[in-house]
């Protein structure tokens, strides 16, 4: 196959509809807009959510909640992710990034107790759950909150 032999799939590309080009085209005169009325006019569409003057649904519902500007979001690492590391090694935020376990650091890294830890590690993270701390110490490792 050569570059000049490439073709797009059948039906994947469509010619644009050319309107106002004579009555025999099927889209002449009113250009597919019907007769007179709001929708035949330029800019004659209502805004999104407009229900013809009836009280719109989004205004009938009460407002709820708020966005906390002080919210801290942590990158999450589970115990079974830490089995990648060698026995006795030190796990920090930097080593987690290097191994692809943490993509974005956000406000820090939190260790959660999902899974089973099979290696002895020294873990240095920003936050740790009680179950995760217990599991790391049961495996013979230590947890340090930085």
UniProtKB/Swiss-Prot annotation:
Can you name a GO cellular component term?
cytosolic large ribosomal subunit
In this chain, the stretch annotated as Disordered covers: 1-55
Q: Where is the composition biased (Gly residues)?
A: 23-35
**Which residues lie in Basic and acidic residues bias regions?**
1-13
Recorded GO MF terms: rRNA binding; structural constituent of ribosome
Kindly list the biological process annotations in GO that this record carries: translation
Q: Name one Pfam family in it.
A: Ribosomal_L27A
Keywords from the named record: Ribonucleoprotein, Ribosomal protein, RNA-binding, rRNA-binding
Family stated for the protein in its record? Belongs to the universal ribosomal protein uL15 family.
Q: What binding partners and quaternary form does the record give?
A: Part of the 50S ribosomal subunit.
Function in brief:
Binds to the 23S rRNA.
Which HAMAP family does its entry note? Answer: Ribosomal_uL15
What is the protein name for this chain?
Large ribosomal subunit protein uL15
Q: Which organism is it from?
A: Lactobacillus helveticus (strain DPC 4571)
């Amino acid at each position: 196959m050569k570059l000049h032999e490439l073709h797009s799939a059948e039906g994947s590309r469509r010619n644009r509809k050319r309107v106002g080009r004579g009555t025999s085209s099927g889209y002449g005169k009113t250009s597919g807009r019907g007769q007179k009325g709001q929708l035949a006019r330029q800019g004659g569409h209502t805004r999104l959510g407009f229900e013809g003057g009836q009280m719109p649904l989004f205004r009938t519902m009460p407002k709820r909640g708020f966005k906390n500007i002080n919210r801290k979001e942590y990158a999450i690492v589970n115990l079974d992710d830490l089995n990648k590391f060698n026995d006795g090694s030190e796990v920090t935020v930097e080593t987690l990034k290097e191994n692809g376990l943490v993509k974005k650091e956000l406000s820090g890294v939190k260790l959660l107790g999902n899974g089973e830890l099979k290696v002895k590690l020294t873990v240095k993270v920003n936050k740790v759950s009680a179950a995760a701390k217990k599991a790391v110490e049961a495996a013979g490792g230590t947890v340090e909150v930085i």
